[in-house]
């Protein structure tokens, strides 16, 4: 029997639970902002870093397909929250919190890309998988 869907579902349950936890422990006041979706912001940046790291290892066949499905598709798919990111941005805009909304969008995208690049670089150069 093929367990690919089970691996993805199990990983998704773990990732979603971790996302919920991070969202609950993060404050809503951040830097100069009274209301900022720091939990969603954090999980997206962490997820970008980890997917960069794991993406390099997957490309070099360091682990099998089942683990890749479990971790990348399941755990990271459940952990990162692009749909929540869109909703959080819309809510900021609806409350006329334009500076927060723009900072959130630019910060998530720029820092997310940097996180992916750093994760890839570390996996490539320090794990010894070229």
From Swiss-Prot:
<keyword id="KW-0472">Membrane</keyword>
<feature type="transmembrane region" description="Helical">
    <location>
        <begin position="38"/>
        <end position="58"/>
    </location>
</feature>
<feature type="transmembrane region" description="Helical">
    <location>
        <begin position="102"/>
        <end position="122"/>
    </location>
</feature>
<keyword id="KW-0812">Transmembrane</keyword>
<keyword id="KW-0813">Transport</keyword>
<keyword id="KW-0479">Metal-binding</keyword>
<feature type="binding site">
    <location>
        <position position="80"/>
    </location>
    <ligand>
        <name>Na(+)</name>
    </ligand>
</feature>
<dbReference type="InterPro" id="IPR003691">
    <property type="entry name" value="FluC"/>
</dbReference>
<keyword id="KW-0406">Ion transport</keyword>
<keyword id="KW-0997">Cell inner membrane</keyword>
<feature type="transmembrane region" description="Helical">
    <location>
        <begin position="67"/>
        <end position="87"/>
    </location>
</feature>
<keyword id="KW-0407">Ion channel</keyword>
<dbReference type="GO" id="GO:0140114">
    <property type="term" value="P:cellular detoxification of fluoride"/>
</dbReference>
<dbReference type="GO" id="GO:0005886">
    <property type="term" value="C:plasma membrane"/>
</dbReference>
<keyword id="KW-1003">Cell membrane</keyword>
<keyword id="KW-1133">Transmembrane helix</keyword>
<dbReference type="GO" id="GO:0046872">
    <property type="term" value="F:metal ion binding"/>
</dbReference>
<protein>
    <recommendedName>
        <fullName>Fluoride-specific ion channel FluC</fullName>
    </recommendedName>
</protein>
<dbReference type="GO" id="GO:0062054">
    <property type="term" value="F:fluoride channel activity"/>
</dbReference>
<dbReference type="Pfam" id="PF02537">
    <property type="entry name" value="CRCB"/>
</dbReference>
<comment type="similarity">
    <text>Belongs to the fluoride channel Fluc/FEX (TC 1.A.43) family.</text>
</comment>
<feature type="binding site">
    <location>
        <position position="77"/>
    </location>
    <ligand>
        <name>Na(+)</name>
    </ligand>
</feature>
<keyword id="KW-0915">Sodium</keyword>
<feature type="transmembrane region" description="Helical">
    <location>
        <begin position="3"/>
        <end position="23"/>
    </location>
</feature>
<comment type="function">
    <text>Fluoride-specific ion channel. Important for reducing fluoride concentration in the cell, thus reducing its toxicity.</text>
</comment>
């Amino acid at each position: 029997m093929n367990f690919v869907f089970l691996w993805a579902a199990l990983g998704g349950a773990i990732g979603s639970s971790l996302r919920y936890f991070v969202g609950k422990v993060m404050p809503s006041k951040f830097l100069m902002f009274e209301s900022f979706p720091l939990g969603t912001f954090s999980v997206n940046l962490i997820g970008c870093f980890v997917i960069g790291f794991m993406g390099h290892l997957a490309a070099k066949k360091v682990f099998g397909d089942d683990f890749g499905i479990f971790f990348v598709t399941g755990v990271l798919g459940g952990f990162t929250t692009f749909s929540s990111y869109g909703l959080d941005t819309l809510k900021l805009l609806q409350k006329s919190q334009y500076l927060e909304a723009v900072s959130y969008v630019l910060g998530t995208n720029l820092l997310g890309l940097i996180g992916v690049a750093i994760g890839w670089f570390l996996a490539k150069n320090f794990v010894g998988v070229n």
